């Protein structure tokens, strides 16, 4: 560790604290992840060492490179390449203007390329979320923390005791399935794909709905504000908006049962027809409310027909029928994919 100088703390993730650091010998800027270990165990589990050592072999342009593993006494440090920002922060910063479709398409395509590579090497992520998708100023997006869930387990709480989000967790996991596949990562990425399209403001949906119900066909105050902001070059900020602007997750549950029910309300309550074997899962209850499937055009309005087709295949209930990363890359949605450069506020 004497070869690294910590510059600043840049985050506290699922497995520990992350620092921006500089290699004193080479001058290279890296992300230094200090893994939080169970104090009741003696040192670092050998299984964890084996798992993360394998990750050093995952060389792909869309996977954050694990440069080194430093094991000292009861501490474990992972040295990763450094990227400017995570997708969550970028989406928050883009909440007022939205993310351009070409950039969403490029990001999803790149992430699927990274997933396809890892899945072909039988490595799952199991905990995909916007916080561990990292971007740079050149338009690249990379998967971070790959394989750490298998090495260290998926904790209930983070380093700072924050409850780990359930928003991107596949229904087979929520229903207690102990043996799952690469399909869990596809589900998570599908949720993130939808979220990149969704922008909301507090009270905006209610405001817009009331405006239209009262027979006024003009734009509601916030829509008018957004239209003016766009016409003026998007120079206004979320802080100056009439209501706080935030992105909206597709399934923002606050407990496992709430998460399941949010999924059911949108995709319909699954039965043996759409998902053979679902009623035999450990946490399935015959008493679950029976909801009908919603029209996808109303769930994610900005998506075109190809986008809705891809999303519905990524969010297929049956993991065996959920589209694979490799197959998704060949979907018509990507026929005009490019690699635009994002406007990052670093």
Curated annotation (Swiss-Prot):
Residue numbers carrying Phosphothreonine: 14, 160
Annotated Protein kinase domain residues: 4-334
A GO term from the CC aspect: Y chromosome
Keywords: Acetylation, ATP-binding, Cell cycle, Cell division, Cytoplasm, Cytoskeleton, DNA damage, DNA repair, Endosome, Kinase, Magnesium, Meiosis, Metal-binding, Mitosis, Nucleotide-binding, Nucleus, Phosphoprotein, Serine/threonine-protein kinase, Transferase
N6-acetyllysine: modified positions: 6
Traits of the deletion mutant: Reduced body size and impaired neural progenitor cell proliferation. Sterility due to defective meiosis; no effect on mitotic cells. Premature translocation of CDK1 from the cytoplasm to the nucleus compensating CDK2 loss. Prolonged and impaired DNA repair activity upon DNA damage by gamma-irradiation.
Cofactor(s) the record lists: Mg(2+)
InterPro entries: CDK, Kinase-like_dom_sf, Prot_kinase_dom, Protein_kinase_ATP_BS, Ser/Thr_kinase_AS
The protein's enzyme class: transferase
GO biological process: cell division; centriole replication; DNA repair; DNA-templated transcription; G1/S transition of mitotic cell cycle; meiotic cell cycle; negative regulation of transcription by RNA polymerase II; peptidyl-serine phosphorylation
N-acetylmethionine modified-residue sites: 1
Catalyses which reaction(s): L-seryl-[protein] + ATP = O-phospho-L-seryl-[protein] + ADP + H(+); L-threonyl-[protein] + ATP = O-phospho-L-threonyl-[protein] + ADP + H(+)
Single GO molecular function: histone kinase activity
Name this protein carries in UniProt: Cyclin-dependent kinase 2
The gene coding this protein: Cdk2
């Amino acid at each position: 560790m004497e070869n690294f100088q910590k510059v600043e703390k840049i985050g506290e993730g699922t497995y520990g604290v992350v620092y921006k650091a500089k290699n004193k010998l080479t001058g290279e800027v890296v992300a230094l992840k200090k893994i939080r270990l169970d104090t009741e165990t003696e040192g670092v589990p050998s299984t964890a060492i084996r798992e993360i050592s394998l990750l050093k072999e995952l060389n792909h342009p869309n996977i954050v490179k694990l440069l080194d593993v430093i094991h000292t006494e009861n501490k474990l440090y992972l040295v990763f390449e450094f990227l400017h920002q995570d997708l969550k922060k970028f989406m928050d910063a883009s909440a007022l203007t939205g993310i351009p479709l070409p950039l969403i398409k490029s990001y999803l395509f790149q992430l699927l390329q990274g997933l396809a590579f890892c899945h072909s090497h039988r490595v799952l992520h199991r905990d995909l979320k916007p916080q561990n998708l990292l971007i740079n100023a050149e338009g690249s997006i990379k998967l971070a923390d790959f394989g750490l869930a298998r090495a260290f387990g998926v904790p209930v709480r983070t380093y700072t005791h924050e409850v780990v989000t359930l928003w991107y967790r596949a229904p087979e996991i929520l229903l207690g399935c102990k043996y799952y596949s690469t399909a869990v990562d596809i589900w998570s990425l599908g949720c993130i794909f939808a979220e990149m399209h969704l922008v909301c403001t507090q009270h905006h949906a209610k405001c817009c709905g009331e405006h239209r119900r009262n027979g006024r066909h003009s734009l509601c105050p916030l829509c008018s504000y957004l239209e003016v902001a766009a016409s003026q070059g998007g120079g206004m900020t979320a802080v100056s908006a009439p209501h706080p602007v935030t992105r909206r997750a597709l399934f923002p549950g606050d407990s496992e049962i709430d998460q399941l029910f949010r999924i059911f309300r949108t995709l319909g309550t699954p039965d043996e027809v759409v998902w053979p074997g679902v009623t035999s899962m450990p946490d399935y209850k015959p008493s679950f409310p029976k909801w009908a499937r919603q029209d996808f055009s109303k769930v994610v309005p900005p998506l075109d027909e190809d986008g809705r087709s891809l999303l519905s295949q990524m969010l297929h209930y049956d993991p065996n029928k959920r589209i694979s990363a490799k197959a998704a890359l060949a979907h018509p949605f990507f026929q005009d994919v490019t690699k635009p450069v994002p406007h990052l506020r670093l």
